[in-house]
Curated annotation (Swiss-Prot):
Top-level EC class as recorded in UniProt: ligase
Species whose genome carries this gene: Pseudoalteromonas atlantica (strain T6c / ATCC BAA-1087)
Leader sequence segment: none
Listed name of the protein: Phosphoribosylformylglycinamidine cyclo-ligase
Pfam families from the UniProt entry: AIRS (PF00586), AIRS_C (PF02769)
Broad class of the protein's primary localization: cytoplasm
GO biological process, one term: 'de novo' IMP biosynthetic process
Pathway note: Purine metabolism; IMP biosynthesis via de novo pathway; 5-amino-1-(5-phospho-D-ribosyl)imidazole from N(2)-formyl-N(1)-(5-phospho-D-ribosyl)glycinamide: step 2/2
Reactions performed catalytically: 2-formamido-N(1)-(5-O-phospho-beta-D-ribosyl)acetamidine + ATP = 5-amino-1-(5-phospho-beta-D-ribosyl)imidazole + ADP + phosphate + H(+)
Keywords: ATP-binding, Cytoplasm, Ligase, Nucleotide-binding, Purine biosynthesis
Enzyme Commission (EC) number: 6.3.3.1
GO MF assignments: ATP binding; phosphoribosylamine-glycine ligase activity; phosphoribosylformylglycinamidine cyclo-ligase activity
């Protein structure tokens, strides 16, 4: 090292190790609140250890990973980060419950150009809340400060979740047949899908996110966290056999419903069985979006859809309502002679 050159540090290059350590200390209590008895050790190790619950005779592990998409851009623009962590967990655990799996543990990845500890702590606190709502443990994660890769304080998040299901109880759609009833569980809003279109509609409408619509600012409608259905559905599965569950995410009705239907069957959806939450009407009107495109992009008020035997529908609806869900019969299954597996009428 020569005397006429400055001594450079990692911080000079844009990576603040002290800020990262501060974040870790601030989120330890968040992780602790999500603890499950199967978890061995705490945060900070090179790997996280978790045993399988002893109640399972032939356990199968179910894994999923997801992000929040461009809902992040809206949250960053509005500087409202509290719900993003819940969204991240919800997008993963709701995919697991589709196969009947109980979420066990969750890991997150937070990447940014310049680490803002307060913002990151809000996001991770939301992740912890999502884990509490779904009964899974936050056992680890990665915070990556990468100057030059992201603009300013912009960030991205990704989540990874592992759950477990009894091998004999896997829900895979194979039992679905004509005559099954479809019940819907209401969404809390657009959840975490379609936000590139949401942002475009905001742009062309000329509306500000602070404008009040249906009793609260548009921003609150649009940043409402994704609803987590895990505990309600696990409670249902204790009493009622379910033939299929679908999570209405990217691709809407047209793409997600066929993912759980056997060939030769179709879902017939009764459009008169529910009213879209008002934010979807606002989006359709201000973006001049066709109804077909709405069902292709958004959940339109339906977060999950469940197929089951017709004589179990009333019991299932009662159980889910007792868990605080907005639930109703939305349609049924019919035989189909073509490749069209969704009919909305």
């Amino acid at each position: 090292m020569t005397d006429n050159k400055p001594s450079l540090s990692y911080k000079d290059a844009g990576v603040d190790i002290d800020a990262g350590n501060e974040l870790v200390e601030r989120i330890k209590s968040v992780s602790k609140k999500t603890h499950r008895p199967e978890v061995r050790g705490g945060l900070g190790g090179f790997g996280a250890l978790c045993s399988l619950p002893t109640k399972y005779k032939e356990p199968l592990l179910v894994s999923g990973t997801d992000g929040v998409g461009t809902k992040l851009r809206l949250a960053m623009d509005l500087e409202q980060h509290d719900g993003i962590g819940i969204d991240l967990v919800a997008m993963c655990v709701n995919d697991l419950i589709v196969q009947g799996a109980e979420p066990l543990f969750f890991l997150d990845y937070y990447a940014t150009g310049k680490l803002d500890v307060d913002t990151a702590a809000k996001v991770v606190t939301g992740i912890g809340k999502g884990c509490e709502l779904s009964g899974c443990a936050l056992i680890g994660g990665e915070t990556a400060e990468m100057p030059g890769m992201y603009h300013g304080n912009d960030y991205d998040v990704a989540g990874f979740c592992v759950g477990v299901v009894e091998a004999a109880d896997v829900i895979d759609g194979s039992r679905v047949k004509a005559g099954n009833v479809l019940i819907a569980l209401g969404s809390s809003g657009p959840h975490s899908n379609g936000y590139s279109l949401v942002r475009k509609i905001l742009e062309v409408s000329g509306c500000e996110a602070s404008e009040v619509f249906d009793g609260k600012p548009l921003s609150e409608h649009l940043l409402e966290p994704t609803r987590i259905y895990v505990k309600s559905v696990l409670h249902l599965l204790e009493s009622v056999q379910v033939n299929a569950i679908t999570h209405i995410t990217g691709g809407g009705f047209w793409e997600n419903i066929p993912r759980v239907l056997p060939q030769g069957t179709k879902a017939v959806i009764d459009e008169s069985s529910w009213q879209w939450p008002s934010i979807f009407n606002w989006l359709q009107e201000n973006g001049n979006v066709t109804t077909h495109e709405m069902y292709r992009t958004f959940n339109c008020g339906v977060g999950l859809m469940i197929a089951l035997e017709a004589d179990k529908a009333d019991e299932a609806i009662a159980i889910l309502k007792s868990q605080g869900e907005n639930v109703w019969q939305i349609g049924h299954i019919e035989d189909s002679s073509d490749n069209n597996q969704v009919e909305i009428k």
